[in-house]
Amino acid sequence: MTQHSRDTPQFYLTAPSPCPYLPGRHERKVFTHLVGDRAGDLNDLLTHGGFRRSQSIAYRPACDQCRACVSVRVIANEFRPSRNFRKVIARNADIIGEQRSAVPTSEQYSVFRAYLDARHRHGGMADMTVLDYAMMVEDSHVETRIIEYRKRGPDSGITGRGEELIAVALTDVLSDGLSMVYSFFEPSQVSRSMGTFMILDHIARARRQGLPYVYLGYWIEGSKKMDYKARFLPQQRLAPSGWLRIDAQGDAASEPQD
């Protein structure tokens, strides 16, 4: 019998379940636990290989006869906002992004609950309680931050703090970028395009920190839920041969970038 080292990650495969993105298909995932002193290094390595983090689990799709889920990362220092993106930035000029430690609050959960009720009422997270939310935020063995997006107040120029909470992003800090784990916003503020704004803000943050990439998770061609990720260009998409550069929708480099 072979005895595995405690430092050697063990990988497991889930049973098939209905795909939440492509009707009529089933999904499977391969996953491992992110624990111990080297959890951050392992998360870095696995993210580069197309994994995503959820609490202390790193996973990626391992579906039979389907490779629709494609990992996407934006090239931060080459990104130039389009006219539409500049409009989103201008529309949210009254918003301050405040980075904090990964500590959940009742104020965050209130926005999270409203977001789920309005946009994901029948999804897998619909029944999450305040304790479930706290676990989602706190159960991390890697470098994780909360970014709160608030409206500017009369004293914001002095204190650097905003007032009403509008949106929240749970973000991992990797050796080569920022990975957006989960984000949500107040549904009454839908006209602000906060989902887009948070990605634009993360691209700007990565650039300021000298980090080359912003990881957006999976893009799925043909899924309306995932179409928005293709708009942030240039970007790289993970293929069997490595990360391929995309400069325009539908275009890909013929050689891996890394």
From Swiss-Prot:
What is the protein's species of origin? Bradyrhizobium diazoefficiens (strain JCM 10833 / BCRC 13528 / IAM 13628 / NBRC 14792 / USDA 110)
An example molecular function term from Gene Ontology annotations: arginyl-tRNA--protein transferase activity
Keywords of the record, alphabetical order, are:
Acyltransferase, Cytoplasm, Transferase
Database matches in Pfam families? ATE_C, ATE_N
A single GO CC term for this protein reads: cytoplasm
GO process terms (BP): proteasomal protein catabolic process; ubiquitin-dependent protein catabolic process via the N-end rule pathway
> Which transformation does this protein catalyse, written as a reaction?
N-terminal L-glutamyl-[protein] + L-leucyl-tRNA(Leu) = N-terminal L-leucyl-L-glutamyl-[protein] + tRNA(Leu) + H(+); N-terminal L-aspartyl-[protein] + L-leucyl-tRNA(Leu) = N-terminal L-leucyl-L-aspartyl-[protein] + tRNA(Leu) + H(+)
Lineage of producing organism: Bacteria, Pseudomonadati, Pseudomonadota, Alphaproteobacteria, Hyphomicrobiales
Please identify the protein, giving its name as recorded. Answer: Aspartate/glutamate leucyltransferase
Q: What is its EC number?
A: 2.3.2.29
